[in-house]
Amino acid sequence: MSGGWAALAALVPAPSGGGGLDAALDSPLGALLRPLGDTPQEPRWHGEGDVLTHTRLVLEALEAAPEFWALDVERRAALWLAALLHDVGKAACTRLEGGAWTSPHHGQAGARLVRALLWREYGLAGEARGRGLRELVCTLIRHHAAPAHLFEAPHPERRLLRLAAQGELVPLFSLRLLKMLAEADARGRLAADRAEALLRLELGFLPAEELGILERPYAFASPRAELAYFEGKLAYPAQELYDDSWGEVLLLCGLPGTGKDTWLRANAPGLAVVSPDEVRAEYGLPPTGPQEEVMRLAAERAKALLRQRIPFVWNATSVSQSLRARQLELFSRYGARVRIVCLETGWETGLARNAARAEAVPEAAIERMLERLEPPERWEAARVDWLCT
């Protein structure tokens, strides 16, 4: 891993001093942070004012917590960075609705922004440790608002177990870290309901303590049972489920230049492959503009294989959950068991590999894909592998 993580860790306050929000504003992270000073919040819930002021209060609350300083160095740095960046998505998501300021889906938007910056500017991609630290920060940002709604949510156990399962793909992640971030977020608000919000957080996490998942994911009976539970097909997490699938379909995803074709030749030789790129080339369809016809034709090829119960590979970039969801639903509907393999490589390595291809993808297009990238989560398929190439 490059010195990218060291540069980020240097921003984190130490007991001896140094670092902090002002230092972060002068770093490459400042591009995400500075707009927050001009981003309003609803006064009923954020009497402190703009998002940057709220961020400063959240950091102060986190740094005042003894359990923050008890964390190991890497988790402490990642948690602080997640607190620093947890609301960067609000700059793009905030709007006035019915006379009140709201910021729907800002956690999801913020995670994408931060992932792209850490991937491209700090070199946290293409090797396991950098990826793990990057995704710990991004996972905390993505889900930082979820704990506030656990107590009133239907099926809170299922939501907690699904959140805890993030630790299967991001081993440094835990519900305890998410709870610490949510508590600091609540303490960083000036609002009449702050004490009540903190109480709801405590109550919302009680099932996690009972299930033993504050520090680690739940041990399901099988991957098939885990997926079925998250899909609502099993009532209790301890249940087992008979695997009635006829075989496996492999969904391969990742940015251009990550080596998907190379991985396939080495790891899945002989399997049929359905590739939107091949469909596009065969029919002379353009790589830019609407792709509905390309995806329709590729889906028809997949259906033909599914009807014959022939295992195959779906080989596409599939960079977002919404893109993958369409294919995953199709494969499951035909009774296949699905395995997702997500490949990633370093930014410069990926660009160089892409440039060496006969039909290179424009770099600007790859940058847009990176900005939309949502790596697969554990609940998307029976098996999810995340590999660096």
How would you label these PLM feature ranges?
Residues 1-97:
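Acidic/His-rich, divalent-metal-binding segments that scaffold phosphate/diphosphate chemistry
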Residues 63-200:
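Divalent metal-dependent catalytic cores for phosphoryl transfer on phosphate-bearing substrates
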Residues 209-244:
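N-terminal pre-Walker A segment at the start of P-loop NTPase domains
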Residues 240, 244-250, 308-310:
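Pre-Walker A (Motif I) flank of P-loop NTPase domains
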Residues 248-268:
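Glycine-rich phosphate-binding P-loop
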Residues 250, 270, 348-389:
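Conserved GTP-binding G-domain of TRAFAC-class P-loop NTPases and closely related GTPase folds
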Residues 261-312, 319, 347-351:
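Conserved substrate/cofactor phosphate-moiety recognition/catalytic segment
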Residues 334-353:
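Conserved phosphate-donor/acceptor-positioning beta-strand/loop module used by diverse small-molecule
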